[in-house]
Amino acid sequence: MIFTSTPPAPPPADAQQRQPRYPGEDTTPTSRREIWGWYTYGIAAEVFAVCGVGSFLPLTLEQLARERGTLLSSHLPCVGPGSPSAAPGNGTTPAMLRRDGLGSDQCVVGLFGLQINTASFAMYTFSLAVLVQALTLISFSALADYEKNRKTLLLTFGLIGSVSSMLFVFISPRLYILGAILVVIGVTCLGSSFVVLNSFLPVLVANDPSIQTARKTEGEELPHLDSSGEYTRSGSFNRGDNRGFDDYVAPEHGLKPKTTDSTSPEMQLSTKISSKGVGLGYCAAVLVQVLSILLLFTLSKTSLPKISGTLPLRFVLLLVGIWWFSFTVVTRRWLRNRPGPPLDTSKGGARWRIWLRLVGFAWKSLWKTVKVAAKLREVVIFLIAWFLLSDAMATVSGTAILFARTELKMSTTAVGLLSITATLSGMTGAFLWPVVSRRLKLKSNHTIMLCIALFEIIPLYGMLAYIPLVKKWGVIGLQQPWEIFPLGIVHGLVSGGLSSYCRSFFGVLIPPGSEAAFYALYAATDKGSSFIGPAVVGVLIDATGQVRSGFFFIAVLIVLPIPLIWMVNAEKGRQEGLAMAEMLEKSHGENSSEFGHPSEEAEGLLARNP
């Protein structure tokens, strides 16, 4: 069984071992094998994030609904022998190479008594998936910090998520609703597992032999990582630079500014491990994406597409699920349990009642953080901007894939190549923007504004096709399939910069000592907003019958954060954060928590979410 414990490898004979901070803590020095166990889960799940969520799941959902749908005007099947778009020659053109639905009529499917555009169906599904993911992340954030729940939840989410992807091979067009349910499950497990995975990194760093040696040399104790968000921040599974996070440290007792500009050994090691994990995950995703395209091309030469146009896509999702499952098993063997503090059962009651109290504690803690943040003007302005911007980023990705398939009539293999283009550009952007910022001597908020301005090019370019003269040309304004590839490069480059610099800029505004709690709020804002945009675009598609109409909403959504980011005064926000930290420190002993130290309040694992 996947959850059966594997005897851990013995630690090196000369390894330094620190004192445990609570009963049952595993302070065994971190081994290279354990770090690779951490890497392997990123290699496993990032494939589903890029190849599944970012590419083939939206296409599969839309195609499943399309094969079940009818044309709005004539009620004829959207695809198949009886459809107006049936290919000549008895429809022998391979489905993966065919541009389905060449007519302009809207393809709709019945759902709860309503006629919904098949592209809207995919957008609504992902909107619901992100909402469920956000609720799950917040609810499980406190529970995963205790006992062996961390590894158990990681393996559980990985197992359920990978199986949900593999089960798509059995989802025929007749069961398209069940396909939507599997998407919700898969997306929820993906985000939740990454949050739990990130919570391992501070523990691995804390027990690394090199850190113990450095601390012994300096004559210092290792800070309590649970009461400081610093290592949580550097350990986040982010996609870029974390500069600006380490201006202050929060020791176990009291707050103090750093007395040195040098980066701490923990920060250096954490950043090194995190960056390598991100790189390995992206490389795995690109590899599987290439394999998926080859698989699609090979299957297009067989009779499978004649059975169902979605069958090759479903085989790709089977491959993705097998990959996720296989590397999760490796993670289970190589990654130690690293249990957290034991649950307090002194008050009696069943364990499930304690778990319910932990869920309530997570929500209550998040609300307390909201009340503190509401008193910080610069934080409020930035979070409003981030609310809009993160929603725009999530909406553009899903809309672009569906636009390429339904409006540009691109084949599935071409859409896969588009995804690879955006992924490689995102990897480049993570390294490029720090260089651009240094060369142009830009402040962090100016870099963010520049990224947003470039991001705005995508919807504006798509809206050019509404100009009659441009429409008459038949090119420019995303009228030809090749035009979307340069925009895919722009999307990748900009996303890499925004994800890193927004997180870094927010770090300057946080009260020292409350980092993890505020990053929980940051992540909740991200996940809590990302379901709105896809739902609105889905409504617009239903109203107009065109995915292109969503560009109007996206253009407004992208441009709104620019004045807000410009309004944020980083220095003033930093001073407000310091003042708030002093105020919180004075009331430190008055706000003790039922499940942990006062300084741990509102942290949870959600703080480690990218």
From Swiss-Prot:
Query: Where are the compositionally biased (Polar residues) regions?
Result: 229-239
Q: Which residues are glycosylated?
A: N90, N445, N591
Report the membrane topology from the UniProt record.
Multi-pass membrane protein
Q: Which GO terms describe its biological process?
A: amino acid transmembrane export from vacuole; autophagy
> Which InterPro entries does the record cross-reference, listed alphabetically?
Atg22, Atg22-like, ATG22/LtaA_families, MFS_trans_sf
**Record's GO cellular component terms:** vacuolar membrane
Q: Which family does it belong to?
A: Belongs to the ATG22 family.
Q: What does this protein do?
A: Vacuolar effluxer which mediate the efflux of amino acids resulting from autophagic degradation. The release of autophagic amino acids allows the maintenance of protein synthesis and viability during nitrogen starvation.
Q: What is this protein called?
A: Autophagy-related protein 22-1
The coding gene here is atg22-1
